[in-house]
Curated annotation (Swiss-Prot):
UniProt KW Protein biosynthesis keyword: yes
Gene Ontology molecular function: any one: translation elongation factor activity
UniProt cross-references to NCBIfam families, sorted A to Z: tsf
Keyword Protein biosynthesis set for record: yes
A single Gene Ontology CC term: cytoplasm
Domain of life assignment: Bacteria
Signal peptide bounds: none
The protein's name: Elongation factor Ts
Function summary: Associates with the EF-Tu.GDP complex and induces the exchange of GDP to GTP. It remains bound to the aminoacyl-tRNA.EF-Tu.GTP complex up to the GTP hydrolysis stage on the ribosome.
Organism listed in the record: Lacticaseibacillus paracasei (strain ATCC 334 / BCRC 17002 / CCUG 31169 / CIP 107868 / KCTC 3260 / NRRL B-441) (Lactobacillus paracasei)
Length: 293
């Protein structure tokens, strides 16, 4: 049996808002596996949803550049938010985005070898900036997105580039595409529509809702109907086109765009530092180590 630590209990409580004993019991039942512990709590009806782990170390900026029917969305990391607000850093990020949109590199290695308008490669520019600023600067990721002449790009940067959202809308106009990009930045949908949800994930969620409903003591014959309703509600919450439009919750994103004569074709959303785990320092252990030393 895995040893359950106070830090694990705290993380689970932070992510699910359950009590300490419920969190500890779930971790014990899941043998220390955080995701399984969340499922245990959800099946018992103790946690309706779980926040994603918020441990983020990297600072930096996300940016979007458009070059005709090609757009590039990028993330460049620095070590502190102070550097992220530096004008030289901002200029570099803009130059990188423009170079990637113009050259459409196939992967990160090719992107770092891409030449910018000043003649330096993306990697050379990062090294030069690192020397000047004194912090490691690096291109973390990018995506190149293409559209047709009948489609529109929508781009939106939140908080100066902490979040970047790029959309592709068929028909409609640039303003509609930007409105949807703003929605994507704010609501953070997981998929374009229900058909994009992986079958494995759909089954996993259906199983959880089934156990949750049974544990509520619902009559067996109505369990499938209740589960179907909960699955549909969940799908509507994670699918962009089915979400309530952030600027007009009385209609879905799909209906808003359709009213403008368009259809949502795709989106990309970057949030600076997402998915990067921050090292958690245990200062009590650090003090004990110093005492023992």
């Amino acid at each position: 049996m895995a040893q359950i630590t106070a830090a694990q209990v705290k993380e689970l409580r932070d992510r699910t808002q359950v009590g300490m004993m419920d969190a500890k019991k779930a971790l014990v039942a899941a043998d220390g596996d955080m995701d399984k512990a969340i499922d245990v709590l959800r099946e018992k009806g103790l946690a309706k949803a779980a926040k994603k782990s918020g441990n983020i170390a990297a600072e930096g900026l996300a940016e979007i550049a458009v070059n005709g029917n090609t757009a590039a969305i990028i993330e460049v990391n620095s070590e502190t938010d102070f550097v992220a607000s530096n004008d030289q850093f901002k200029d570099y990020v803009n130059n990188v985005a423009a170079a990637i949109a113009a050259n459409k590199p196939a992967d990160l290695e090719a992107a770092k070898a891409t030449k910018m308008s000043d003649g330096q490669t993306v990697d050379e520019g990062a090294i030069a900036l690192t020397t000047v600023i004194g912090e490691k600067i690096s291109l973390r990721r990018f995506q190149v997105v293409e559209k047709t002449d009948n489609e529109h790009f929508g781009k939106y940067l939140h908080n100066g580039g902490q979040i970047a959202a790029l959309t592709v809308i068929e028909g409609a106009d640039d303003d509609t595409a930007k409105d949807v990009a703003m929605h994507v930045a704010a609501i953070n949908p997981e998929y374009l529509d229900r058909t994009k949800v992986p079958a494995e994930e759909l089954k996993h969620q259906t199983d959880i809702f089934t156990e949750e409903t049974k544990n509520e003591g619902k009559p067996e014959k109505i369990v499938p109907r209740i589960v179907e309703g909960r699955v549909n509600k969940w799908l509507g919450e994670i699918s962009l086109v089915d979400q309530e439009f952030v600027k007009d919750p009385d209609q879905t994103v799909a209906k808003y765009v359709a009213a403008k004569g368009g259809k949502v074709k795709g989106f990309v959303r970057y949030e600076v530092g997402e998915g990067i785990e921050k090292k958690q320092e245990n200062f009590a252990d650090e003090v004990m180590d110093q005492i023992k030393g």
